[in-house]
Design a protein with these regions (language model features):
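Short S/T/G/P-rich N-terminal loop/turn motif that feeds into the first structured element of a domain
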Residues: 7-74, 83-90, 116-120
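Bacterial N-terminal signal peptides
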Residues: 1-7
Length: 120
């Protein structure tokens, strides 16, 4: 009986761990003089990080379309998914992420980042 309860508990904990994802939400406010072609080029480089950095488990991008008008000029949004805090931390110091940061730095007016554990 005790072994059955222990097995069920371990199984539930393993399932819970699989469902947890660390989300790294990034918004860019590009400078006004940056062309859409340049933004597209930068986004392609950002997306390539998913193939270069094993810790990235998912990458999504999109444009703000909220009718509320509360985006404070942030239009380009990116959601990067990690399985662990350690994976996110490795991403932050990864040489390819550093190179991308150097590329995007001169063309953005501001950056907004929020990390959170996704739960259901």
């Amino acid at each position: 009986m005790v072994l059955s309860v222990l097995f069920v508990t371990i199984t539930i904990k393993a399932e819970e761990k699989k469902l947890k994802h660390l989300r790294h939400f990034v918004c860019f406010k590009y400078k006004n003089n940056i062309s859409e072609d340049k933004i597209t080029e930068i986004e392609k480089d950002f997306i390539k990080l998913e193939k270069k950095i094993d810790d990235i488990k998912g990458f999504e991008k999109g444009l703000n379309n909220s009718p509320e008008g509360l985006n404070k000029g942030f239009k380009h949004c990116y959601l990067i998914t990690f399985d662990s805090k350690e994976g996110r931390d490795r991403y932050l110091v990864h040489s390819d992420h550093k190179k991308f940061s150097e590329l995007v730095g001169p063309v953005v007016e501001d950056v907004f980042v929020v990390d959170y554990w996704a739960t259901k």
